[in-house]
UniProtKB/Swiss-Prot annotation:
EC number of the protein: 1.5.1.40
Keyword Protein transport: no
Annotated family: Belongs to the F420-dependent NADP reductase family.
GO-annotated biological processes: copper ion import; NADPH regeneration
Protein name, UniProt field: F420-dependent NADP reductase
Keywords recorded for this protein, A-Z: NADP, Oxidoreductase
GO cellular component: plasma membrane
Record's function text: Catalyzes the reduction of NADP(+) with F420H(2) via hydride transfer, and the reverse reaction, i.e. the reduction of F420 with NADPH. Probably functions in the regeneration of NADPH required in biosynthetic reactions.
GO molecular function terms listed in the Swiss-Prot or TrEMBL record: 8-hydroxy-5-deazaflavin:NADPH oxidoreductase activity; coenzyme F420 binding; cupric reductase (NADH) activity; ferric-chelate reductase (NADPH) activity; NADP binding; oxidoreductase activity, acting on NAD(P)H
Record's keyword annotation contains Transmembrane helix: no
Binding site for NADP(+): T9, G10, D11, Q12, S30, R31, K35, L75, V101
InterPro entries on file: NAD(P)-bd_dom_sf (IPR036291), NpdG (IPR010185), P5C_Rdtase_cat_N (IPR028939), STEAP_metalloreductase (IPR051267)
Reactions this protein catalyses: reduced coenzyme F420-(gamma-L-Glu)(n) + NADP(+) = oxidized coenzyme F420-(gamma-L-Glu)(n) + NADPH + 2 H(+)
Length: 223
């Protein structure tokens, strides 16, 4: 499967690229092709040191969106709306994974505080713009440092929600490829309001306890 990660040069997107490259072709997207190519080269070198010959390329966001079977939006909240409005045609009919969180850093405030999007959540905002795409919300509660630590499994459940059952299953299967992850179907896209709100809490715990990256596990749940 071809996975395009728009904004894949950032920490979260880069970590996902490393974790998903074992079984998929990864297309790292950026506003500048040169920056995307540099990130792709770096990711390939990291994985090659571990004996993995990964298929990773770098493209501008528009071309990456066009190429991907599944497109992951790894974009700061403040740039998400403007970016997806420019890519509506490229994203038409595709599975689009929203991993964004409306952190107050978008307005110069603390990352432990949350903004409240008019649509209810980042994922719902994306779906309301990309009406012909299948938007799935996932990966908000896993820290980039944990994703990039390839020496250890990812000790975190991935909470997934969306309105299209088939698209949601694709994303759940994708998340379950990551060593240590258990992906959980949490229901329709509205649940992203709750899932996104967990992230600033986790960031606060990381700061308070000097953790490299807290995660979340749902206990007493057999799936």
């Amino acid at each position: 499967m071809k996975i395009a990660i728009l904004g894949g040069t950032g920490d979260q997107g880069f970590g996902l690229a490393l974790r998903l490259a074992k079984n998929n072709k990864i297309i790292i997207g950026s506003r500048k092709k040169e920056k995307a190519e540099e990130a792709a080269k770096k990711a390939k070198e990291i994985l090659k040191q571990r004996g993995i010959e990964a298929d990773i390329i770098g493209l501008e966001n528009k071309d990456a969106a066009k190429e991907g079977d599944v497109v992951i939006l790894s974009l700061p909240y403040e740039y998400t709306l403007s970016t997806i409005k420019q890519l509506k045609e490229e994203l038409k009919g595709k599975i689009v994974v929203s991993i964004g969180v409306p952190l107050a850093t978008a307005i110069g405030d603390k990352p432990t505080r949350l903004l409240f999007p008019p649509d209810g959540s980042v994922a719902e905002m994306v779906q309301n713009v990309l009406k012909e795409s299948k938007v799935v919300s996932a990966f908000q509660n896993v820290c980039h440092a944990v994703l990039e630590d390839l020496d250890n499994p990812v000790d975190c459940d991935i909470l997934v929600c969306g309105n299209d059952e088939e698209a949601k299953k694709v994303v759940i299967d994708l998340a379950n490829q990551i060593d240590g992850v258990r992906a959980i179907d949490c229901g329709n896209l509205e649940k992203s309001r709750i899932i996104e709100a967990i992230t600033p809490l986790l960031i606060g715990l990381n700061i308070k306890y000097k953790s490299k990256g807290t995660g979340i596990r749902i206990t007493n749940l057999e799936i």
